[in-house]
Amino acid sequence: MSLNNYWSRLLQTQWRDGGWLSRLLHPLSRLVDRSVRLKREAYRDGRKQAWRAPVPVVVVGNIYVGGTGKTPVVVAVLEGLRARGYTPGMVSRGYGARIQGPPRVGQGQLDPAAFGDEPALIAAATGAPVAVHPRRALAAQALLAAHPEIDVIIADDGLQHLALARDIEIVVQDERGTGNGLLLPAGPLREPPARLNEVDAIITNLNTGPAQVAQTGAARHWAMWLEPLDAQRVTDGKRQALSAFRGKKIAAAAGIGNPGRFFRTLESAGLSPSPRLALPDHYDFSRSPFHDVRAEAIFITAKDAIKCARLKDTRLWSVQVRACFSDPDFLDWLDARLRNLP
C-alpha cells in the first residue's frame, strides 16, 4: 500500500469512527465550526445579502465532503420537473473548470474542461441548460438572461453557497450518515449535523447496504438507490445489457468521490470486476490508466466517460444508472412545494 493510500484510508476511518488523528485535529474543526456559524449569522441578520432569483431555486447538496450521490438526484429532479410541465435549468460551481471571466452557459454536449465534469454529464443526460461560475448567483443571472423561459433553477452542490437565496433545500447523504459528527478536518462535515434539521428534505443513498443516518426532526426523508440500466461503449455509443458481460474478464474504474459505491453497483448487477481501479475524484484521463489492465471490457462511470472518448479504447463501457426512490411521491412532493411557494 502506498503512503498516500495509507493516509487516505486512515483519514476515512477516523472520519467514520473517530480516533487519535481526529482528536488531534479537533481544535482546527472548532475554528471551522465558528467560521461556518459566523457566515450563516451574517446572512441571517442582513450583514451579507443573498441574491434572490425571480424564479424558485432548489438546492441539491450535502454536508458530508465528497461523493454522496448528488448527480443522479439532480438528473432525476430535472427530468421529473420537466415531465410535470416545468422548464428547469441548472447552475453549478463548475468544479475542475477554470472560470475566471463571466459565467459559461451551455446546453447538450459540453466540454468538461470548460464546464466541469458534473455539469457536462448533467447537460448531456437531461438536455437542460446549465450555467457555471464559482459565484452561483452570477451563474443564475447568466442562465436566465440566456434562457428566459426557465421557471425553476436547480443549484447543484450549492448548500453552503449562501450568496444565492434558495426556496427549497435537499440534502443527499449516504450510508455514512454524518460520520463521527465533526467538521473538517477532524471529521467529514462541511456544516454541523444540526444543519439537517433546517433543510426541507433528506435523501439517503442506500447503495446496497443498510443506512446509518442521522435522526432529524424537520425534514422529509426518502431513501434512494442507483439502479444499473445498461452499458454504453464509449467509442461508438453501442448499448448492451450488463448481463451480456457475465462470465467475461471484466475490470472497473471510477474517478469519483466514492469509487466503492460504483463497484458495489456493478456487484448488484451480478458482475465481479477485477481489477478495480479507484482513481482520484475528477481524474482528467489525460493519460490512460488502462494500459496494463488485462480485460475484455472495462466499466467506468458516466461522469468519467465524458472525458474518455479521446482514449479511443474500445474496451471502455459507461454504466448507465437511474436514481430510484423508496417512495415515488418524492417528485410529486417537490412539485407541490414549488406550486405552493409564496
UniProtKB/Swiss-Prot annotation:
ATP binds at residues 64-71. It is an enzyme of class 2 (transferase). Keywords: ATP-binding, Kinase, Lipid A biosynthesis, Lipid biosynthesis, Lipid metabolism, Nucleotide-binding, Transferase. Pathway: Glycolipid biosynthesis; lipid IV(A) biosynthesis; lipid IV(A) from (3R)-3-hydroxytetradecanoyl-[acyl-carrier-protein] and UDP-N-acetyl-alpha-D-glucosamine: step 6/6. Pfam families: LpxK. InterPro entries: LpxK, P-loop_NTPase. It catalyses: a lipid A disaccharide + ATP = a lipid IVA + ADP + H(+). Transmembrane segments: none annotated. GO terms for molecular function: ATP binding; tetraacyldisaccharide 4'-kinase activity. Transfers the gamma-phosphate of ATP to the 4'-position of a tetraacyldisaccharide 1-phosphate intermediate (termed DS-1-P) to form tetraacyldisaccharide 1,4'-bis-phosphate (lipid IVA). Belongs to the LpxK family. This is Tetraacyldisaccharide 4'-kinase. The gene is lpxK.
